[in-house]
Amino acid sequence: LEVAANATQDEWFYFSPYEGITDYEDIDWYDYFLARGFAVVLSAGIGTNNSEGFETCGSDVEIDAFAAIIEWLTGDRVAYTDKENNIEVKADWSNGSVGMTGRSYAGTTQFGLAATGVEGLKTIVPVSGIASWYDYYNCQGVNIGTDEQIAGLAMYCAGRYINKEDWATIEESYGAYLHQMAEDMFANGNDYNDLAWSNRDYTLGDGFKCSALIVQGLNDYNVRTKQAEMMYNSFKAAGLDVKMLMHQGDHITPTHQDTHAPIP
């Protein structure tokens, strides 16, 4: 609690000049859980603002980084108050039972974590999550997304460019990484290849243990319904409790009051 009291809000609740919004834009939504006795943990991904490393757009490296947070919540990993010292901080308030929810990219990472079988993850409620990054951007060898595909989205989500001094330390090396990512991605044109896509296909995971309530908009033309179906089938194949909630909205969270998406 002492560490939390000394934290500064602008480290995680800040205005993004590139998007024109404040992250996290839906922070009040978590009041629903807090009022019901849950603790809420929000974590930046690797390569994002105030973090380290490269943003890798859904790779196994990114998923493993999020898994480390769950391991900390279950007491299986050590964490420190900041990057410079060795003062350990424990999640002694956590009972080790973790659930996840979130939309779009935050729904996608849930699929990735569920596929790892990380201990402590009991259930997920992903909204408009991506099951396979190849199938998000391509369909049987035809590009149906942006030309840059995962390399472009990785750059967009990097976030470290908000801090110009920090960005200067990785700009050249990260540019080289993105170039290699594009080379791998287009090794077979727009056809699938293991080099870029297999570690971003969460349906291939063999560690599924948790339950899932998968939420998907029938009119979502960003993350299409195929993604929800693919992940539903993976949970079913693993013999797990999985349900789907389909609504008539698009790329939205139907419980948010400002979306006005009716649930049939």
Spans of model-derived segments:
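Conserved alpha/beta-hydrolase "acid-adjacent" motif
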Residues: 221-229
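Accessory cap/linker subdomain of secreted extracellular hydrolases
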Residues: 2-19, 23-30, 35, 63, ...
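Short beta-strand/loop motif that positions the catalytic acidic residue
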Residues: 208, 214-216, 220
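Conserved alpha/beta-hydrolase
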Residues: 34-50
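Structural recognition of the beta-strand scaffold that forms the well-ordered cores
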Residues: 39-44, 97-102, 107, 122-128, ...
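Catalytic nucleophile-loop/oxyanion-hole region of alpha/beta-hydrolase
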Residues: 23, 49-68, 76-80, 256-263
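Alpha/beta-hydrolase active-site loop signature
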Residues: 46-49, 131, 251
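Catalytic histidine neighborhood in serine/cysteine hydrolases
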Residues: 235-253
